[in-house]
């Protein structure tokens, strides 16, 4: 297993100690702290786990797949060995898998099919501040299972921005907080035009960013439809050295993987 240092690393002994004593934990950690990938791996050899699986809940398919791939690389393995993932229409787990990264719908179905959650020792709810009905339902069902059937089941709720103190009181759980990584950020406001479509405004903003800043450009858009419209417009306006790539959960795995690979020398990227 490769040794990587993240801001969360210093807190991992306390995470393990807390779960040795309590069945629930609220963990606050800002983006970049490493909580998504380091907490499940740190718990793999906990005595209370007893060889059972850890379920890591992610709200998006792209995040689920990426988290599993990162943890597998850290272990020097392929996805589907110690760490795997299950998302809609895609299953990368095996009999060896100890950490399963799943999306919210998968967890709900698991709870419905097997209320005892046999063979599962912990459920980690990641990015819980991204409140979804499926995530809230999953936590409610897991709490019910823990209270009625499985008092040995561990539940970890992790968030970057949620009110951790209030959530800890609700769950009757200890609360731990981690530091994050800070990066210098400059905020510029691009003037909007009410008489211009969103796609045209985004195109102008991207062109300005490419002209005035080095490096790649990451554009957040409301959904797949907007991504496709901006993609079509930018293909006709950026130069040949700039690659424009979409990124959303409906893309095939190979296309999503392209975004996560380094760009060729001398080329820039716009990721939508």
Question: Where are the model-predicted features located?
Answer:
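P-loop NTPase motor module signature
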Residues: 1-272
């Amino acid at each position: 297993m490769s040794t990587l240092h993240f801001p969360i690393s210093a807190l991992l002994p306390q995470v393990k100690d807390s779960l040795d004593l309590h069945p629930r934990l609220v963990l606050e950690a800002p983006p970049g702290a490493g909580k998504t990938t380091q907490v499940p791996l740190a718990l793999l050899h906990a005595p209370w786990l007893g060889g059972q699986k850890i379920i890591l809940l992610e709200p998006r398919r792209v995040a689920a797949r990426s988290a599993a791939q990162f943890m597998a690389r850290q272990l020097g393995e392929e996805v589907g060995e110690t760490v795997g993932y299950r998302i809609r229409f895609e299953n990368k787990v095996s009999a060896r898998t100890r950490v399963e990264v799943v999306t919210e719908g998968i967890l709900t179905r698991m709870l419905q099919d097997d209320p005892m959650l046999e063979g599962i020792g912990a459920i980690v709810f990641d990015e819980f501040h991204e409140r979804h009905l499926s995530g809230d339902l999953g936590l409610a069902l897991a709490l019910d299972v823990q209270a009625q059937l499985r008092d040995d089941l561990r539940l970890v709720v992790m968030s970057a921005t949620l009110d951790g103190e209030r959530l800890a009181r609700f769950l009757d759980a200890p609360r731990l907080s981690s530091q994050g990584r800070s990066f210098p950020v400059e905020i510029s406001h691009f003037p909007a035009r009410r008489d211009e479509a969103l796609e045209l405004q985004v195109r102008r903003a991207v062109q300005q960013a490419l002209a005035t800043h080095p490096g790649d450009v990451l554009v957040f858009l409301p959904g797949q439809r907007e991504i496709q419209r901006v993609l079509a417009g930018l293909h006709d306006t950026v130069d040949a050295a700039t690659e424009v790539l979409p990124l959303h959960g409906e893309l095939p795995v190979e296309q999503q993987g392209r975004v996560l690979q380094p760009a060729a020398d001398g080329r820039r990227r716009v990721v939508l």
